[in-house]
UniProtKB/Swiss-Prot annotation:
PANTHER family membership: MULTIFUNCTIONAL PROTEIN ADE2 (PTHR43599), SI:DKEY-6E2.2 (PTHR43599:SF3)
One Pfam short name: SAICAR_synt
GO MF assignments: ATP binding; phosphoribosylaminoimidazolesuccinocarboxamide synthase activity
GO terms, biological process: 'de novo' IMP biosynthetic process; cobalamin biosynthetic process
Annotated protein name in UniProt: Phosphoribosylaminoimidazole-succinocarboxamide synthase
Species assigned in the record: Staphylococcus aureus (strain MRSA252)
Reaction equation(s) it catalyzes: 5-amino-1-(5-phospho-D-ribosyl)imidazole-4-carboxylate + L-aspartate + ATP = (2S)-2-[5-amino-1-(5-phospho-beta-D-ribosyl)imidazole-4-carboxamido]succinate + ADP + phosphate + 2 H(+)
Length: 234
C-alpha cells in the first residue's frame, strides 16, 4: 500500500487491486484556501461517514460516483479516476463569495440554480473561469463541460430533496469530477459540510464549515448533528 496523494483533508493510497484506491479522511480543517487551519479530533470520521451516506443516496437515485464502499470510520474504497482540475459550484441561494463579487444580498434565492467553474490551482487561488477559459486551458471539451453542468444540476436536485427531508436548505455546494480510463466522467472527492453551505429551514443556522470560518460555533458538534439527521432518515 503506497501513499499516492495527500491533500488538505484526505490521503489516497494504492491497494492490491488495480481498480481500487483507499481514501483516508484526515482530522485537519482549513478555510480560506488553507489560510486558516486546525486539527480537530473526529473531523475525518464525520466527513467520511457523511460522504459515504450521501454517495450511497446519490447512487440509489441514479448518480454514479467513484465511491465503492466505506471501509472504516475514516476510510473509503473508491474507483481510480483522473481528477478534472475544476471545482464545480452550484448555487441555489446567494451567500459567500458571490455576494461580494456581484452584490447579491445574502440569502437571496435564485430563480434557477447557477453553475460556476473554478480552476483548481492553489498558486492562482482557484480563480473563477468561463467555459472558454476551460477550453483554452485544455481542461475539458465542449461535450465534457456540458456533461459536468448536467451532472451538477442532477446532483443538486437529489441533494435538495435530501436536505428538505432533514428540514434544511441547500444554499450551495462544491463538487469535483474525474475521468475513468474509458473516459467516463464520475462524481469524485467528497460531499460533506466541508463542501456544502447548508442552512436550517426555520432559523438559517449554519450546518456547514461557515461555523469554523466565522467562529460562530463548534464544527465537530455541528457536523455530528448533521450526521445524526442523515442517519435518522435511514
Amino acid at each position: 500500500m503506497t501513499l499516492l496523494y495527500e491533500g488538505k483533508a484526505k490521503r489516497i493510497f494504492s491497494t492490491n487491486q488495480e481498480n481500487e484506491l483507499r481514501v483516508e479522511y484526515k482530522d485537519e480543517v482549513t478555510a480560506g484556501n488553507g489560510a486558516k487551519k486546525d486539527t480537530m479530533a473526529g473531523k475525518g470520521r464525520l466527513n467520511n461517514q457523511i460522504t459515504s451516506i450521501i454517495f450511497k443516496y446519490l447512487q440509489e437515485n441514479g448518480i454514479e460516483s467513484h465511491f465503492i464502499k466505506q471501509l472504516s470510520e475514516t476510510e473509503q474504497l473508491v474507483k481510480p479516476v483522473k481528477i478534472i482540475p475544476l471545482e464545480v459550484v452550484v448555487r441555489n441561494i446567494a451567500s459567500g463569495s458571490i455576494t461580494k463579487r456581484l452584490g447579491f444580498e445574502n440569502g437571496e434565492v435564485f430563480r434557477e440554480p447557477l453553475v460556476e467553474f473554478f480552476y483548481k490551482n492553489d498558486a492562482l487561488n482557484d480563480p473563477l473561469i468561463t467555459d472558454d477559459h476551460i477550453k483554452l486551458l485544455n481542461i475539458a471539451t465542449d461535450k465534457d463541460i456540458e456533461t459536468l453542468k448536467t451532472k451538477a444540476l442532477e446532483i443538486n436536485q437529489v441533494l435538495k430533496q435530501l436536505m428538505h427531508a432533514m428540514s434544511l436548505k441547500l444554499v450551495d455546494f462544491k463538487i469535483e469530477f474525474g475521468k475513468t480510463e474509458t473516459g467516463q466522467i464520475l462524481l469524485a472527492d467528497e460531499i460533506s459540510p466541508d463542501t456544502c453551505r447548508i442552512w436550517d429551514k426555520a432559523t438559517n443556522a449554519n450546518f456547514d464549515k461557515d461555523v469554523y470560518r466565522n467562529n460562530t460555533g463548534s464544527l465537530i458538534e455541528t457536523y455530528q448533528i448533521f450526521l445524526n439527521k442523515l442517519e435518522d432518515l435511514k
